[in-house]
């Protein structure tokens, strides 16, 4: 329970007034609960979307659902997406890329990445067959994002100094990763049947490609690339679901 509270405090802005000492060993073992944090975020997103959809047009409800995640997470991983885009697409050497990611200012690549991320997200949501399924997507996608993050923890090499937030998860054992993937697959299968499982296969393929690209650019992962991977992973899952729905 302490590990779950610590993960909630780490990845969200949910106010839990309990001071817990950072135990990296137990945090790594308890990282199997990370998709459950995604479930909490997803439940909040679903609630906001559903309530707004009762009184407002669907596009407005979709925007509200997207904004709900920014509220509960503080835009933690959206900021990581911007930093990652600024760094990896700066055409600089590895050391300079890492410096750019640490810079609190957002560059042109970061702004472009965020704009197209949300435009693509909104367009895909509007392509979903029904509002009922959109609600379920708001619930499921944050779970997928945390599943992708867990995959990126596997045999992770940390880029730069080991003082960043992401370095806490260096050396996560294989079994929390396996448990997290089973949980994600269970939720996707329960909600979307075999279509959800097919979509996650696409997510796994994306994760492999993304990991390979990042390692070639900066030699490993850091907090920004981990967060960006989760954000893009849920977008890829949504894309795959819409693609399969369009084919069947």
Curated annotation (Swiss-Prot):
Protein's organism: Listeria welshimeri serovar 6b (strain ATCC 35897 / DSM 20650 / CCUG 15529 / CIP 8149 / NCTC 11857 / SLCC 5334 / V8)
Function: Joins adenosylcobinamide-GDP and alpha-ribazole to generate adenosylcobalamin (Ado-cobalamin). Also synthesizes adenosylcobalamin 5'-phosphate from adenosylcobinamide-GDP and alpha-ribazole 5'-phosphate.
Subcellular location: Cell membrane
InterPro entries: CobS
Catalytically driven reaction(s): alpha-ribazole + adenosylcob(III)inamide-GDP = adenosylcob(III)alamin + GMP + H(+); alpha-ribazole 5'-phosphate + adenosylcob(III)inamide-GDP = adenosylcob(III)alamin 5'-phosphate + GMP + H(+)
Class in the EC hierarchy, top level: transferase
GO cellular component: plasma membrane
Transmembrane segments: 24-44, 47-67, 70-90, 106-126, 134-154, 165-185, 186-206, 228-248
Pathway(s) per entry: Cofactor biosynthesis; adenosylcobalamin biosynthesis; adenosylcobalamin from cob(II)yrinate a,c-diamide: step 7/7
Family statement: Belongs to the CobS family.
Identification of the protein by name: Adenosylcobinamide-GDP ribazoletransferase
Coiled-coil segments: none
EC number in record: 2.7.8.26
Necessary cofactors: Mg(2+)
Pfam families from the UniProt entry: CobS
Alphabetic keyword roster: Cell membrane, Cobalamin biosynthesis, Magnesium, Membrane, Transferase, Transmembrane, Transmembrane helix
GO biological process: cobalamin biosynthetic process
């Amino acid at each position: 329970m302490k590990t779950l509270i610590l993960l909630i405090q780490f990845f969200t802005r949910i106010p839990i007034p309990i001071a817990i000492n950072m135990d990296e060993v137990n945090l790594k073992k308890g990282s199997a609960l990370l998709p459950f944090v995604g479930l909490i975020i997803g439940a909040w997103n679903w609630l906001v979307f559903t309530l707004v959809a009762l009184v407002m047009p669907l596009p407005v409800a979709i925007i509200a659902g997207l904004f709900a995640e920014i509220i509960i997470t503080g835009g933690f991983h959206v900021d990581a997406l911007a930093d990652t885009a600024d760094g990896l697409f700066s055409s600089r050497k590895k050391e300079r890329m890492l410096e750019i990611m640490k810079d609190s200012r957002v560059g042109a690549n970061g702004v472009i990445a965020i704009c197209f991320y949300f435009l693509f997200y909104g367009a895909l949501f509007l392509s979903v067959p029904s509002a009922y399924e959109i609600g379920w997507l708001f619930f499921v996608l944050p779970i997928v994002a945390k599943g992708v993050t867990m995959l990126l923890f596997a045999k992770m090499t940390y880029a730069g100094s080991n003082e960043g937030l992401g370095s806490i998860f260096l050396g996560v054992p294989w079994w929390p990763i396996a448990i997290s993937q089973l949980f994600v697959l269970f939720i996707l299968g329960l909600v979307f049947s075999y279509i959800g499982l097919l979509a996650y296969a696409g997510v796994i393929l994306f994760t492999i490609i993304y990991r390979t690209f990042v390692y070639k650019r900066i030699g490993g992962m850091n907090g920004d690339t981990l967060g960006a991977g989760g954000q893009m992973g849920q977008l890829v899952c949504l894309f795959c679901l819409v693609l399969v729905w369009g084919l069947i």
